[in-house]
Amino acid sequence: MKIERIEITGRDQWLNLRKPDVTASVVAALFGAHPYTSALKLYLAHSGVEFDQADDRVLRRGRLMEPAVALAVSEERAEWQIEKCDSYYRDPDLRLGATPDFFIHGDPRGLGVLQTKTAAPHIFERDWEGGATVPFWVQLQVLTEAMLTEAAFGAVAVLRVDAFDLALAIVEVPRHPAAEQRIKAAVAQFWEDVAAGREPDPDYGKDAELLKVIAPHEVVGTTVDLSGDNELPALLEQREEIMTGIKGFEARKDEIETMLKFKMRDAESVVGLPEWGISWKSQHRKEFVVPAKDVRTLRIHHKGQR
């Protein structure tokens, strides 16, 4: 592999360096394994669609906590010298890039890459099994970073973010030539699909927002013939059952809330139920005007029911 190393001089420059490439942080989307990004979103992003570079609370937490995780690793693995990575690494032929969080020096095996993560307690237990394992999407990220930097090994440090106990787990990710070949093959296939205009199948659990980009408006008078779709009738029946169940739950919820209000009458709050905080207060809502806009509305009804 021919690898380019480009020094990072600022965040905007770094973001621009990443734009032409599939990067290690999202390569798992090509395997349907990324928790936030799908192959379709990646395809659209590299087909001219501009997405906001949102810096949400989770990303901000990870960025701010990154030095703390590295410090914790230094305390637990005193033989390692941890160095912040200041460069972007890319294979220009494959258009695959990576920026490891840190490099590890001082290990007898040679250079290592360190990926730092933070996790809420329930995520730490559910996805990381209490620090015993690394989620598949993170494994793919670290394997890509190690491959592009020609590191001897990779490691992941995850810090459980808890107000009273900042537990740290360090899990090594060995180089895996077969897995690395699969990563390279998936990236090469992705770029072939982009060039040929072959759109990946959507991930229905992640891609709802992409419909606003793909089909923001209907073409008046057009129809789509789904008579050959054998799966859809059963799914529509399933949806009908779910909607009926939701209506039943909502009706019962309203009954319980009405009963509670009658018991409270003009009281502002409830005492005597130590497990529950209940109040019924008046709230002033300012007048506001909703700006006009066109919104596509999906309506489904069973033709055998009125």
Q: Residues of each region from the PLM?
A:
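Accessory terminal regions of nucleic-acid processing enzymes
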Residues: 1-306
